[in-house]
Amino acid sequence: MLKIADTTFTSRLFTGTGKFSSPELMLEALRASGSQLITMAMKRVDLQSGNDAILAPLRQLGVRLLPNTSGAKTAEEAIFAARLAREALNTHWVKLEVHPDVRYLLPDPIETLKAAEVLVKEGFVVLPYCGADPVLCKRLEEVGCAAVMPLGSPIGSNLGLRTRDFLQIIIEQSKVPVVVDAGIGAPSHALEALELGADAVLVNTAIAVAHSPVQMAHAFRLAVESGERARLAGLGASPFNPSQPDTLQLRATATSPLTGFLSQLEEQDHV
């Protein structure tokens, strides 16, 4: 179970709504994912329509909607978008995104922190998308963010956990949930994040652009469940599991030592 603010989730796979070829396919894939937290860009929602093509089907799912401030280039724009979402959708949850760089969509750390401080004071449950910067994530936690969402790699890149070392530091020191967001392009990436100790992952592009989004959504669901189970079971020491540095050994260890067996053979030879 994962608790963020006042809500408990049984699924650690959060999903997005962009890039699907149709609202119907989006809805089917989201159902297959088992996701209970779904993010949506306010800039893509027709707030004047009571039957918006994106919003209406999402409300059928009975999940928590997480409006995001994608498109905001400054703290002020993000704050305005968050307030608009609260009024339009009757939610105080917001995924805070401030990325003025239109090419790489990298989050602006200064503007993100500024906006987070204001929104937290206004009673929002703030989940900020941010760079994999341990210092920034700690500052966001200190101003009251309910979780932090550091990137694995640039949005939509499908490159996986290119920031792994920094993610590990963030996970180790964080007192709020860590949700790896952006760049997760395969179920194996999601599994890796959960094994590393992340509390959840957010996936959009890898599901939406797959040949079969529904099957891919289900694959991510299984990967996240497997990653969490593996972490809870206790991963053995290896260079890929730095959570056990004291037991790390860069040499082979036989699972079935031959010492006793060879000794018996030597004794038989002498008989």
Curated annotation (Swiss-Prot):
Its main location: cytoplasm. The keyword Transport does not apply. GO terms for molecular function: thiazole synthase activity. Keywords: Cytoplasm, Schiff base, Thiamine biosynthesis, Transferase. Its EC number is 2.8.1.10. InterPro entries: Aldolase_TIM, Thiazole_synthase_ThiG, ThiG. Pathway: Cofactor biosynthesis; thiamine diphosphate biosynthesis. It holds the Pfam family ThiG. The keyword Thylakoid does not apply. One of its GO terms (cellular component) is 2-iminoacetate synthase complex. GO terms for biological process: thiamine biosynthetic process; thiamine diphosphate biosynthetic process. Homotetramer. Forms heterodimers with either ThiH or ThiS. This is Thiazole synthase. It comes from Yersinia pestis. The lineage of its organism: Bacteria, Pseudomonadati, Pseudomonadota, Gammaproteobacteria, Enterobacterales.
